[in-house]
């Protein structure tokens, strides 16, 4: 029987999510990869236990994480039954819907029918009565934003989720409309989940200003750029890498000379600070309190242990930030 580490809350940094009462760990664990049918169940269990023992209380999923679709939630539900059923109130769980999930016109995008059906399916797979956050996973130009946000409001009011969130709403005006519609309905938007890293700074073009103004938290997914910011691709493509195993999200054309030179420059900054490149990348994402948490993935427990050390590093100096801007802005 799993017994969590007694000191799990002593060393983790928790940050306030926007202007809410919610605190999230500086590093959260995403189950986008490595929790489907291709990853041994024992390895999944080791990742979850390692994270929780380090004070990581937030696990993030989506309805179509796998492979196949739904498998990450299904596997998490088995872990929930085995290890976490007596610790549910210590966990902050999220899932999402918005991308393709099942066949036909009602298994994708942002309709009320899709979102309500999806949360019901997710709760069954995850073996929980509710999630802490339910996100709309991406904007849907074909569905009125009032319908999509109305569905999130209904899900919260029905007790199937405690909070509403949005993800991949990169247009600042569109994000603001969604946030204000949720507020009008009486279910404030807790959090936005965008892609944000040293190699993708799109959210700095107005979105972070909106989140700050509206008091909405931000959790950055892919802060290590799907592994590019670990440095593992600087000397070629490892045979066991995700780029070889599954090239859908990280393609070989990302390894262009300009990107590789940027990564080498960032690695030099990290080494001068006594850090790994991944630790520098995570610390940089969290340099602004607008970003509540950095959402990491992991294939081995030691990756989680190393990444959490980013929270203990000395602050980045102004000179270091300027060097980083010169390499990435």
Residue positions per predicted region:
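Short, acidic/polar
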Residues: 39-51, 110-126, 175-179
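Alpha-helix N-cap and loop-to-helix initiation/capping positions
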Residues: 39-43, 71, 75, 106-114, ...
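N-terminal small/glycine-rich loop or linker at the start of catalytic domains
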Residues: 18-36, 94-107, 130, 135
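Beta/alpha (TIM)-barrel catalytic core signal, keyed to glycine-rich beta->alpha loops juxtaposed to Asp/Glu
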Residues: 2-11, 139-328
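A short, structured active-site edge motif that brings together acidic residues
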Residues: 88-101, 193-195
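Short, well-ordered coil/turn segments that N-cap beta-strands
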Residues: 22-27, 55-57, 85-91, 128-132, ...
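Active-site groove signature of glycoside hydrolases
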Residues: 123-143
């Amino acid at each position: 029987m799993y017994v969590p580490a007694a000191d799990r809350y002593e060393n983790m940094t928790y940050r306030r999510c926007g202007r809410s009462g919610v605190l999230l760990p500086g590093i959260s664990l995403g189950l986008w990869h490595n929790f489907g049918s291709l990853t041994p169940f024992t390895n999944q269990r080791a990742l979850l236990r390692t994270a929780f023992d380090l004070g990581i209380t937030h696990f993030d999923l989506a309805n179509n994480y796998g492979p196949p679709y739904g498998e990450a939630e299904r596997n998490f539900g088995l872990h929930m039954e085995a290890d976490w059923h007596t610790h549910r109130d210590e966990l902050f769980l999220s899932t999402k819907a918005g991308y393709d999930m099942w066949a036909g016109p009602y298994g994708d995008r942002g309709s009320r029918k899709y979102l309500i059906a999806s949360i019901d399916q997710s709760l069954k797979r995850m073996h929980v009565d509710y999630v802490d956050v339910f996100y709309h996973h991406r904007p849907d130009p074909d569905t009125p934003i009032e319908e999509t946000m109305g569905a999130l409001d209904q899900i919260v009011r029905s007790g199937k989720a405690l909070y509403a969130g949005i993800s991949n709403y990169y247009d600042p005006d569109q994000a603001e409309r969604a946030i204000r519609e949720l507020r009008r309905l009486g279910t404030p938007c807790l959090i936005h989940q965008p892609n944000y890293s040293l190699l993708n700074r799109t959210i700095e073009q107005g979105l972070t200003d909106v989140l700050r103004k509206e008091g909405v938290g931000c959790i950055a997914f892919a802060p290590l750029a799907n592994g590019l910011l670990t440095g593992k691709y600087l000397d070629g493509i490892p045979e066991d890498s995700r780029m070889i195993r599954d090239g859908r999200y990280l393609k070989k054309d990302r390894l262009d000379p300009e990107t590789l030179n940027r990564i080498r420059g960032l690695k030099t900054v990290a080494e001068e600070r006594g850090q790994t490149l991944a630790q520098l990348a995570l610390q940089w994402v969290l340099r602004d309190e607008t970003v509540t948490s950095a959402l990491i993935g992991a294939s081995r427990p030691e990756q989680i242990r190393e990444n959490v050390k980013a929270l203990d590093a000395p602050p980045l100096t102004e000179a270091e930030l300027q060097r980083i801007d010169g390499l990435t802005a």
